């Protein structure tokens, strides 16, 4: 195996940065007035994290009313636990090791299986960049299948399935029995477009999870070499998830930046992370990320394979790509984007497009097909890819290499031809019991978004859909987190299981930490809006709690319950910075005399007073009649 012919220049301070890599990057996760809570499963080592936001009391003329804590889904892992000791150089605790050992269908390999992995492990030039706590990789024993889909089809409920059932339920079954939550748990009926959305938290059971996985409608991306993972589920009949991208490039960003960006993404709520690195030290960057990631990590293996050829697509080979798959699988990558649906005969269909082929992976494979005038080797070797995937339980994210790059190209012949091929490949992967999700567009005008979901459900047999947006207009560079967030909320409502975030830098440059924050918050909004629209149990709880806090002028609770407490408070404090303003019954928008909510409260107080006066008069009238109705005695 040869080393890459070209690599980007890296910072001369990389080694020093790694040596100084802060142990407290994650300790800064001090969510305001929040508490980390663990929900206990059927065994001691199933401890499912959530965050509870504590609220202040409400003070009224009638006395004090306690407001209960609000549970929220938490992706921050140990970084959100104030009691945890975090050392990025040591990696995260291995919470799944006992589960893997007990199943008895994997083995610890004596060494790495990938030629390139072995080469990197013994290269003295990368010694200063290596994560030093690497353990030997696992692989399925000969004849064994270790995927969550395989277990589900055998009727087995794994600890991972129980974990995600508890996580999705968010103890709402318990709260629904408590009177203080009765009003807060009220919500509008959703429209699910035929999805099998649970109607009550009690229905979100480990058996329900198993059934959804067995049917192929959901996946738990959980590589057996990622024991640090806190399991999560991606499926139409569960909470809508979001993915955050990171990765260095040939022109900018360093290894340490990507590790910090990953941790930063978790703080704001990324459910999964895709490492899209295309620059130097891809292998080492990925190792640091996975060892410190409590969420699933996805990659596009063709990017690294291309780096190994010096960026020459024509030089790609099946053997090189196969070695890259094994290399990444043994590091612990949980899902691979594989552009196996870009077929030779589809490439000419893109000739009349306004923007042609915009997917990096799609363009790489299209160029290879044309250069060799042969069928895509990812398609012709698909069964062999499945054999690798099921040996490590890596999930497919079947790539949309022919997705539209502008709304003019949306829903065209080439896009849907590829989608239909992805359905064919889904069926083939399922015969190997390999988990599958389907990637989708892209750029689609709003009126044509639903058609994408309909086509995917029909031709890909309800495998989870994973979409990039879609962007519903092309006129807003710098604001594409908004143009795509609009499409994302809609397609999430229609049934998309996971939304890939878009940052303000889309089409313009590599995002920095603030861009990542903005992208994730925007997509948390879109996913939550979709959950509300499809009627996910308890989805409206946080909305109701925040609305109540707003009406009662509990400013601090408004900040705490928001998706971005820091930004909400900073915007408030720009005009009313005094501490007393946080208990004032008005804001700078209307002022004290014109606040609609303050006026409404005064009207209610007046009405209550009038009601009391009327009641008093009525009582006096009754007393007067009882005494004989005489004016003078």
UniProtKB/Swiss-Prot annotation:
KW Iron (keyword) present: yes
GO biological process: thiamine biosynthetic process; thiamine diphosphate biosynthetic process
The protein's name: Phosphomethylpyrimidine synthase
Single GO MF annotation: carbon-carbon lyase activity
Gene Ontology, cellular component aspect: cytosol
Organism: Neisseria meningitidis serogroup B (strain ATCC BAA-335 / MC58)
Binding residues for substrate: 245, 274, 303, 339, 359-361, 400-403, 439, 466
Residues reported in the UniProt entry to bind Zn(2+): 443, 507
Described function: Catalyzes the synthesis of the hydroxymethylpyrimidine phosphate (HMP-P) moiety of thiamine from aminoimidazole ribotide (AIR) in a radical S-adenosyl-L-methionine (SAM)-dependent reaction.
Reactions accelerated catalytically: 5-amino-1-(5-phospho-beta-D-ribosyl)imidazole + S-adenosyl-L-methionine = 4-amino-2-methyl-5-(phosphooxymethyl)pyrimidine + CO + 5'-deoxyadenosine + formate + L-methionine + 3 H(+)
Assembly: Homodimer.
Cofactor binding, note field: Binds 1 [4Fe-4S] cluster per subunit. The cluster is coordinated with 3 cysteines and an exchangeable S-adenosyl-L-methionine.
Record key words, sorted: 4Fe-4S, Iron, Iron-sulfur, Lyase, Metal-binding, S-adenosyl-L-methionine, Thiamine biosynthesis, Zinc
Record flagged with keyword Iron-sulfur: yes
EC numbers, comma separated: 4.1.99.17
This protein's pathway: Cofactor biosynthesis; thiamine diphosphate biosynthesis
């Amino acid at each position: 195996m040869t080393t890459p012919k070209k690599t980007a220049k890296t910072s001369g301070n990389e080694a020093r940065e790694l040596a100084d890599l802060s142990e407290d990057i994650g300790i800064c996760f001090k969510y305001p007035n929040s508490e980390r809570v663990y929900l206990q499963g059927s065994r001691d080592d199933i401890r499912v994290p959530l965050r509870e936001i504590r609220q202040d009391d409400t003070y009224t003329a009638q006395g004090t009313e306690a407001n209960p804590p609000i549970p929220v889904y938490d992706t921050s892992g140990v970084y959100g636990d104030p009691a945890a000791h975090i050392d990025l150089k040591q990696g995260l605790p291995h919470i799944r090791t006992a589960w893997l050992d007990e199943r008895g269908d994997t083995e610890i390999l004596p060494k790495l299986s990938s030629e390139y992995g072995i080469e990197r492990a013994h290269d003295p030039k990368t010694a200063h960049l290596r994560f030093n706590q690497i353990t030997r990789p696992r692989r399925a024993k000969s004849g064994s299948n270790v995927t969550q889909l395989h277990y589900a089809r055998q009727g087995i409920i794994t600890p991972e399935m129980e974990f995600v059932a508890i996580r999705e339920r968010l103890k709402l079954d318990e709260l629904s029995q408590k009177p203080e939550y009765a009003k807060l748990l009220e919500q509008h009926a959703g429209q699910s477009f035929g999805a099998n959305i649970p109607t009550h938290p009690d229905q979100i059971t480990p058996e329900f999870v198993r059934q959804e996985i067995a049917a192929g409608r959901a996946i738990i991306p959980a590589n057996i070499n990622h024991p640090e993972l806190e399991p999560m589920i991606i499926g139409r009949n569960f909470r809508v998830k979001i993915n955050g991208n990171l990765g260095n490039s040939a022109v900018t960003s360093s290894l340490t930046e990507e590790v910090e960006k990953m941790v930063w993404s978790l703080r704001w709520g990324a459910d999964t992370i895709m490492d899209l690195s295309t620059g130097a030290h891809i292998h080492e960057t990925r190792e640091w990320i996975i060892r410190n990631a409590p969420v699933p990590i996805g990659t596009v293996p063709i990017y690294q394979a291309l780096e190994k050829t010096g960026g020459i697509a024509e030089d790609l080979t099946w053997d090189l790509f196969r070695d890259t798959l094994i290399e990444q699988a043994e590091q612990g990558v949980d899902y691979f984007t594989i552009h196996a649906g870009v077929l030779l005969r589809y490439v000419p269909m893109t000739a009349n497009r306004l923007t042609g082929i915009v997917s990096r992976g799609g363009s790489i494979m299209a160029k290879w097909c044309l250069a060799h005038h042969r069928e895509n080797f990812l398609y012709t070797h698909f069964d062999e890819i499945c054999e690798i995937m099921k040996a490590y339980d890596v999930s497919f994210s079947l790539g949309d290499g022919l997705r539209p790059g502008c709304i003019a190209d949306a829903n065209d012949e080439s896009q849907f031809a590829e989608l239909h091929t992805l359905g064919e490949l889904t069926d083939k992967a399922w015969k190997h019991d390999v988990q599958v999700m389907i990637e989708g567009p892209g750029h689609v005008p709003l009126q044509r978004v639903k058609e994408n979901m309909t086509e995917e459900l029909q031709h890909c047999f309800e495998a989870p859909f994973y979409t990039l947006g879609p962007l519903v207009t092309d006129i807003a560079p710098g604001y594409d987190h908004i143009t795509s967030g609009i499409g994302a909320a809609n397609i999430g409502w229609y049934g998309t299981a996971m939304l890939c975030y878009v940052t303000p830098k889309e089409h313009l440059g590599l995002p920095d930490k603030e861009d990542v924050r903005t992208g994730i918050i925007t997509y948390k909004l879109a996913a939550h809006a979709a959950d509300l629209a499809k009627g996910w149990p308890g989805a409206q709880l946080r909305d109701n709690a925040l609305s109540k806090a707003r009406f009662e002028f509990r400013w601090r609770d408004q900040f705490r319950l928001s998706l971005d407490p820091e930004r909400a408070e900073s915007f408030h404090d720009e005009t009313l910075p005094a501490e007393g303003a946080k208990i004032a019954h008005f804001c700078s928008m209307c002022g004290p005399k014109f606040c609609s909510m303050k006026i409404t409260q005064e009207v209610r107080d007046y009405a209550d007073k009038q009601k009391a006066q009327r009641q008093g008069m009525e009582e006096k009238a009754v007393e007067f009649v009882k005494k004989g109705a005489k004016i003078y005695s």
